[in-house]
C-alpha cells in the first residue's frame, strides 16, 4: 500500500513530499532551490557545509539531512538565512586561497557559482592567506589544498574497486585537511580519476592533463546560474 504524501510548506508555499525524503529532496521536487556545497547526488549527505541551513519552528537545521514531517513550516529564502549563507560563502573564500581567474575549475566551480548567485563582492571577513600545499597525489591526480573546502565529497565518493577510500580527513578544526593516498590514487583508472575531479565542487582535485580545455562561454555555469535547473523545472 502506497503511503500518503507528506504535506508541508516552504516559505508559505504548499508542498508535498514522499515519505523519507529530506527537506532538500522535497524542495527540489517542488521546484524550490536550496543551496548546498557538500551534497552530491547518490551519496549519503553529511550536512557539513551548512549552506543548506533552513529554519523550522525557530530551529536551524541542515536541509540535506533533516527528514520532512507532516505540517512542517520551513523557512528558506528569507533575508537573515540568505545573509547567513552569503557569510558562509565569504568564509570559504577568505579561509582558502581562491584565485578564480587562474583556476582550471572557473566556470564549473560550485563555490564560484554560489558567490555569483549571492552577489558576493568584498567579503566582510579579513583574508587569512594560509600557507597550503599543492600535492602531486600519484600519477593521475593533483591535490590543490589552497582551494579545498573540506566538504568531504571526495572522502565519501571516491573509492577503489575493492572499496578502499582514496581520500581521508586529517586533524580537526581549522587544521583539518584532506589526505590523498598516492598509491591508491595512482591505481584509479582514467575514468575514475576524472570522476574524482568532477565530484569536487571546487578546483581542489585536478586530473593531470591539459588544463582550460573548455573555452569561456561553454562552461557549466556560463550557460545558466546555479540552481536555475531546479527553479525552471517548476515554471
Predicted regions and their residues:
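Fe-S ferredoxin-like electron-transfer domains
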Residues: 50-51, 59-235
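A structural connector/turn signal
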Residues: 12, 38-41, 143, 185
Amino acid at each position: 500500500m502506497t503511503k500518503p504524501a507528506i504535506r508541508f510548506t516552504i516559505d508559505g508555499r504548499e508542498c508535498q513530499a514522499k515519505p523519507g525524503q529530506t527537506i532538500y529532496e522535497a524542495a527540489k521536487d517542488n521546484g524550490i532551490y536550496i543551496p548546498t556545497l557538500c551534497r552530491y547526488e547518490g551519496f549519503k549527505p553529511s550536512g557539513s557545509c551548512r549552506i543548506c541551513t533552513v529554519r523550522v519552528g525557530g530551529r536551524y537545521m541542515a536541509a540535506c539531512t533533516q527528514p520532512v514531517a507532516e505540517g512542517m513550516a520551513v523557512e528558506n529564502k528569507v533575508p537573515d538565512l540568505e545573509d547567513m549563507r552569503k557569510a558562509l560563502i565569504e568564509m570559504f573564500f577568505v579561509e582558502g586561497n581562491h584565485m578564480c581567474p587562474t583556476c582550471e575549475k572557473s566556470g564549473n566551480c560550485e563555490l564560484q557559482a554560489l558567490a555569483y548567485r549571492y552577489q558576493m563582492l568584498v567579503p566582510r571577513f579579513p583574508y587569512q592567506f594560509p600557507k597550503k600545499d599543492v600535492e602531486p597525489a600519484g600519477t593521475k591526480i593533483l591535490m590543490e589544498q589552497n582551494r579545498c573546502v573540506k566538504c568531504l565529497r571526495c572522502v565519501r565518493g571516491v573509492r577503489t574497486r575493492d572499496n578502499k577510500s582514496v581520500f581521508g580527513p586529517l586533524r580537526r578544526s581549522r587544521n583539518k585537511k584532506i589526505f590523498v593516498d598516492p598509491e591508491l590514487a595512482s591505481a584509479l583508472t582514467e575514468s575514475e580519476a576524472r570522476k574524482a575531479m568532477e565530484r569536487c565542487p571546487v578546483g581542489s582535485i585536478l586530473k593531470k592533463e591539459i588544463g582550460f580545455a573548455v573555452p569561456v562561454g561553454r562552461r557549466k555555469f556560463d550557460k545558466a546560474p546555479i540552481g536555475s535547473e531546479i527553479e525552471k523545472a517548476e515554471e
